């Protein structure tokens, strides 16, 4: 490896060969290459300096940054300090022998520290060619070691962070979406404001009455057992892991070994065209933080065993202390931003658990303070002092990767009073956080949705509970337990997770950017939340959660509680723009099928696409109706061969994949991604008597010249019967066909579809149907169409592209779509589905109205009615209970024995009113914006009022807040107030 390498954006010093001739130093200051310390390779630059001495690097840097660049050019280096200094190192870039840009780096540390300073954060202003970097020593003589000096490199604007060495760097991170990773200094200062000093000069004990259970429960969760038998073979294998790390402790106490690193810090090194292959290889040669953590954790667990001999215990303890000191010396310590620290929580859990489990060993060896401080710093524990009015969301990344270790960092404080006060503050913060989720900000919504990336996101929800459930369990038998309302919210959200998933599998319509059919929710959180007891704290076991856990884990019972049957019922979750319906299978009553209808709106994004995820997912929420069979093995989804234009139930323009593929931009306040919003506010669900409905106004996006695509869509679900209506289907695309997909079903075993009574499973079958046809898919769901609609059916090998990498995929599929032709105008559709149809019987129903203003139906068996008012309108049907609505609402109604039950909701979350000017161009077309940049991201839902008119004179059975009844012309006017798109159920009598 060279000492100096010339790279695309600037030179880099690796110091592996001879002393380079580009370096000069002022008199009497010694420069040499040293093997004492190194961050890469085996050598670093050793500078023995006198006060105010200078070291000059004669390298040209071409500095030119766009004002709003997402990857500002950045200077990076690693410094090893043997002795803390009170005055800083000054670094100045010169242009024509004059200082153009400069900055300070504090030297108040020992060991390694990395600095990353964007040129735009330096003092001064300059562009163009910079000729020299002059480093000026502090006021006292000393020795510093430098390595991996990168003169200039593009770095994502979210990654450089302020820390103790360079507190002025990139203070924008304090308000970024990613602040939980990067605003470590801000959170550290919050903690310091309340605890200027922490007392480590006292004996560490963890057996005090009101806290002992927290330590015990965390250790029970982690499987710590003193009776664990450690065999000689286990010990040998474990010690071999330490040999692999090649760590050497020297007489002066310093430790050499490969650099300690983590994947997200290495990301910038892997960007194509930034570093040559040799340089990249040198930079990436490291001990990974997570691997070191895993080895330390196993050592800590072994050290808790009573079966160790004194000799073996000594061996393990030496390794444990060596590994801990190595991590700290590498710069992974309080106050250090480690150059880049984003997403490090995914790499640290084992390390921090190792320190928590080995806390008594650390205390005995004077390492409790630095390890506790590092845990507190990297988990941003200081956020427990966030002001109440600033807590507007719950970030699942925090709950998953930081919360547990925030708590454990406080449990490692030896001063009992400080620990007690800090835990009480954490309790208050956690209660508030769980109950705060404004607008489309992250966290736990009142309807059971769990938000991340400003949308209901089960893939992240499972991770949130992965970290949250053990924490709730650990705290629940102590004075620091959750409040009843916070615990209740978590229980509700967790129980909902097993409603909208099937045997832990996340439906495709809820898959976010992972439409692979492979993602599942975790089961363990149900166990730990069950063992945390009831929300009111009165019972040590939550039996509802126990029954759910037993079912999900395929056990007959758990803690003496029998497993539940799979859920049945209907649910409206309007923060997810979603209706859910489940019924027990006729073949297997313990199991239930799952139907989910879902849309999107001007508040809720319709897709999330990244460079290597969900490239073709634009239509995912265009009114999809996903039906998952009671027997999950019969599912019709296959990632291979799937036509991304044809999610079941969606109305779409069928495009070639090169046109359907997401064209990614980096928008202000966002990463490189696509998350498109609609212009419409009407999308959501309603329920009554365990039946449901869903409706939406669909509008395509002008980013892809699809602003002319519109449709009003609805589903009405009564038991196993679904009535699907569409109207106002239009667009001006004359090149491609518009279609509504009935089903797309993988048939790898040539499973049959029954069409008008005849079995079809012959490959390359292509049919055009247009006569009130009946189709039955391979799981027995019957689709019945009304006359006058053209259905295209195919049974063939289907070729597609992988959504992650565009590689070709294929599978056999049976597919049926209603064709609306090219550039349709005011088209509509009507079909019904009998899920698990009995005796090939189609649903019986009456359409009360089917036009652009209103979709309304009546189910024959239940006599229930459903109304999707897309706008204010009157009804013309003699069979309808309703006469009109003065606003866009959804209503479900049932008359029985002189009683009328209504469920009314306006699905508009109403987070803002009117149109946002910056979302439209001067022609009125929608502009792509990031939801993260919206001022209404954390807005409160505002109430909306609507009045419906019902035939006849009706009165409330009991007075109801927010419901006003008036009578006019022998009819009843009912005014309701909707907030957060939550349905209002009203009971009336004649």
Curated annotation (Swiss-Prot):
Organism lineage: Bacteria, Pseudomonadati, Pseudomonadota, Gammaproteobacteria, Enterobacterales
Enzyme class label: lyase
General function of this protein: Broad-specificity glycosaminoglycan lyase, which acts in an exolytic fashion, and preferentially degrades the tetra- and hexasaccharide derivatives of chondroitin sulfate and dermatan sulfate produced by the chondroitin sulfate ABC endolyase, to yield the respective disaccharides. To a lesser extent, is also able to split off disaccharide residues directly from polymeric chondroitin 4- and 6-sulfate, dermatan sulfate, chondroitin, and hyaluronan. Is not active against keratan sulfate, heparan sulfate, and heparin.
Source species, domain of life: Bacteria
Noted pH dependence of activity: Optimum pH is 8.
Listed EC numbers: 4.2.2.21
Gene Ontology annotations of biological process type: carbohydrate metabolic process; glycosaminoglycan catabolic process
Name of the protein in question: Chondroitin sulfate ABC exolyase
Catalysed conversion reaction: Exolytic removal of Delta(4)-unsaturated disaccharide residues from the non-reducing ends of both polymeric chondroitin/dermatan sulfates and their oligosaccharide fragments
Organism of this sequence: Proteus vulgaris
């Amino acid at each position: 490896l060279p000492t100096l390498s010339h790279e695309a954006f600037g030179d880099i010093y690796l110091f592996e060969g001879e002393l380079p001739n580009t370096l000069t130093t002022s008199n009497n200051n010694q420069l040499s290459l040293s093997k004492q310390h190194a961050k890469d390779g085996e050598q670093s630059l050793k500078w023995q300096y006198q006060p105010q001495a200078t070291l000059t690097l004669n390298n040209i840097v071409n500095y030119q940054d766009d004002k709003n660049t997402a990857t500002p050019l950045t200077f990076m280096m690693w410094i090893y300090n043997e002795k803390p200094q009170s005055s800083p190192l000054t670094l100045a870039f010169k242009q024509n022998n004059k200082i153009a840009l400069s900055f300070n780096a504090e030297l108040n540390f020992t060991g390694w520290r990395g600095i990353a300073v964007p040129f735009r954060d330096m003092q001064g202003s300059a562009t163009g060619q910079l000729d020299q970097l002059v480093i000026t020593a502090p006021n006292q003589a000393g020795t510093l070691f430098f390595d991996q000096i990168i003169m200039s490199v593009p770095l994502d604007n979210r990654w450089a962070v302020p820390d103790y060495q360079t507190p002025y760097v990139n203070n924008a991170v304090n308000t970024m979406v990613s602040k939980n990773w990067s605003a470590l200094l801000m959170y550290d200062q919050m903690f310091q404001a309340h605890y200027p000093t922490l007392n480590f000069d006292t004996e560490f004990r963890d057996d005090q009455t009101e806290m002992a259970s927290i330590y015990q429960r965390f250790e029970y969760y982690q499987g710590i057992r003193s009776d664990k038998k450690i065999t000689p073979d286990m010990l040998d294998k474990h010690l071999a892991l330490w040999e692999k790390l090649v760590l050497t402790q020297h007489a002066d106490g310093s430790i050499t070994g490969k650099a300690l690193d983590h994947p997200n810090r290495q990301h910038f090194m892997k960007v194509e065209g930034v570093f040559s292959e040799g340089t990249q290889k040198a930079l990436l040669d490291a001990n990974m933080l997570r691997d070191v953590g895993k080895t330390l954790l196993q050592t800590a667990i072994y050290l808790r065993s009573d079966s160790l001999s004194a000799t073996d215990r000594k061996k393990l303890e030496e390794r444990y202390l060596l590994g801990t000191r190595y991590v700290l010396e590498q710069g992974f310590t309080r106050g250090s931003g480690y150059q880049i620290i984003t997403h490090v929580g995914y790499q640290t859990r084992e390390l921090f658990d190792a320190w928590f489990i080995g806390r008594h060993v650390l205390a005995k060896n004077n390492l409790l303070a630095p390890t506790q401080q590092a845990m507190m710093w990297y988990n941003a524990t200081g956020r427990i002092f966030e002001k109440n009015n600033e807590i507007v969301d719950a970030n699942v990344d925090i709950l998953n990767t930081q919360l547990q270790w925030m708590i454990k960092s406080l449990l490692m404080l030896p001063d009992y009073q400080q620990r007690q006060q800090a835990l009480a503050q954490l309790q208050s913060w956690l209660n508030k956080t769980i109950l705060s989720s404004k607008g489309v900000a992250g966290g736990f919504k009142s309807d059971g949705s769990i938000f991340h990336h400003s949308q209901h996101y089960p893939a992240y929800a499972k991770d949130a509970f992965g970290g949250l459930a053990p924490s709730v369990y650990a705290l629940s038998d102590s004075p620091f337990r959750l409040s009843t309302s916070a615990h209740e919210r978590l229980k509700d959200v967790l129980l909902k997770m097993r409603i909208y998933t099937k045997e832990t599998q996340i439906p495709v319509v809820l898959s976010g950017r992972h439409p692979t059919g492979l993602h599942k929710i975790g089961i363990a959180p149900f166990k730990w939340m069950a063992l945390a007891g009831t929300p009111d704290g009165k019972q040590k076991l939550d039996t509802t959660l126990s029954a759910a856990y037993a079912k999900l884990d395929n056990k007959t019972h758990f803690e003496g509680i029998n497993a539940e049957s799979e859920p049945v019922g209907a649910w409206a979750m309007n923060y997810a723009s979603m209706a859910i319906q489940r019924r027990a299978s006729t073949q297997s009553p313990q199991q239930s099928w799952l139907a989910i209808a879902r849309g999107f709106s001007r508040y809720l994004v319709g897709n999330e696409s990244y460079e290597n995820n969900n490239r073709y997912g634009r239509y995912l929420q265009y009114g999809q109706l996903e039906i998952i069979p009671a027997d999950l093995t019969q599912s019709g989804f296959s990632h291979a061969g799937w036509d991304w234009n044809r999610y079941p139930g969606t109305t779409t323009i069928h495009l070639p994949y090169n046109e359907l593929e997401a064209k990614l931009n980096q928008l202000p306040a966002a990463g490189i991604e696509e998350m498109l919003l609609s212009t419409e506010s009407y999308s959501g669900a309603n329920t009554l008597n365990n039946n449901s409905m869903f409706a939406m106004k669909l509008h395509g996006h002008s980013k892809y010249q699809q602003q002319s695509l519109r449709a009003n869509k609805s589903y009405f679900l009564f038991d196993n019967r679904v009535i699907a209506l569409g109207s106002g289907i239009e667009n001006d695309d004359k090149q491609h066909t518009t279609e509504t997909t009935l089903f797309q079903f993988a048939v790898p075993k040539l499973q049959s579809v029954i069409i008008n009574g005849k079995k079809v499973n012959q490959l390359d079958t292509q049919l055009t149907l247009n006569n009130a046809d009946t189709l039955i898919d391979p799981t027995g769901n019957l689709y019945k169409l009304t006359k006058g609609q053209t259905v295209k059916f195919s049974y063939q090998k289907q070729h597609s592209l992988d959504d992650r990498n565009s590689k070709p995929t294929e599978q056999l599929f049976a597919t049926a779509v209603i064709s609306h032709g090219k550039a349709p105008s005011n088209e509509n559709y009507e079909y019904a589905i009998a899920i698990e149809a009995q005796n090939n019987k189609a649903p019986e129903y009456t359409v009360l109205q089917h036009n652009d203003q209103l979709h309304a139906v009546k189910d024959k068996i239940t006599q229930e009615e459903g109304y999707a008012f897309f706008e204010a309108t009157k009804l013309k049907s003699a069979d309808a209970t309703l006469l009109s609505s003065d606003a866009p609402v959804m209503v479900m109604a049932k008359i029985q024995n002189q009683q009328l039950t209504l469920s009314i909701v306006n699905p508009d979350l109403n987070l803002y009113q009117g149109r946002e000017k910056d979302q439209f161009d001067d022609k009125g077309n929608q502009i792509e914006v990031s939801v993260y940049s919206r001022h209404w991201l954390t807005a409160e839902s505002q109430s909306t009022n609507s009045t419906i008119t019902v035939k006849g004179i009706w009165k409330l059975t009991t007075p109801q807040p927010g419901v006003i009844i008036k009578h006019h012309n022998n009819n009843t006017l009912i005014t309701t107030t909707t907030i957060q798109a939550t349905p209002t159920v009203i009971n009336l009598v004649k």
